[in-house]
Amino acid sequence: MKRGITRREREVTDMNAILEILDKSMIVHIAMIDGDEPYLVPMNYGYTMEDGKLTLYVHGATEGRKIDVLKTNPKVFIEMDCDIAPIEGKLACQYGTSYSSIMGTGTAVILEDPEEKMKALSILMKTQTGKDFEFNERLVSIVSVIRIDVAEYTAKARPIPPGLMK
């Protein structure tokens, strides 16, 4: 069963605000299923957004648990967040945390084509640093690059209430 956002008033639908969350978040948490166990890894990422279609790129070692799991079951759940700050109150129930986040489901594809890997790593580095980098086949041959085709995502935000801003 698919569920929607419980707190609809926190849903973010404005594309500029969604892009801001993607730009400010530095880490994507990627959840997978390893047999009958959940498995989660935090990773740096790059992204493209074309016509509302979100694609993420991550990289890492060419072997290990993450690669083994994704070869068996490429379905993933992603989460990223930013703008984390405490919200204080006079009563315990008034405390909370402000945030902006994106969550979604997708399919991970382990890239094999050197050209596609070079392009993906360039996107990742541009997202993370704002700078352009070039890669060659030798460099991409020693790293795995994973593309996550995000099928569905939602964005939410809970800003600090105006009266509590410092």
Segments and roles (model prediction):
Residues 31, 44-46, 79, 107, ...:
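Residue-level recognition of well-ordered beta-strand positions that form the cores
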Residues 23, 63, 71-76, 123-130:
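Short, intrinsically disordered, mixed-charge
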Residues 25-62:
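Short beta-strand segments
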Residues 2-9, 83-166:
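Charged, gly/pro-rich active-site loop segments
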Residues 1-29:
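Short, basic/aromatic recognition patches
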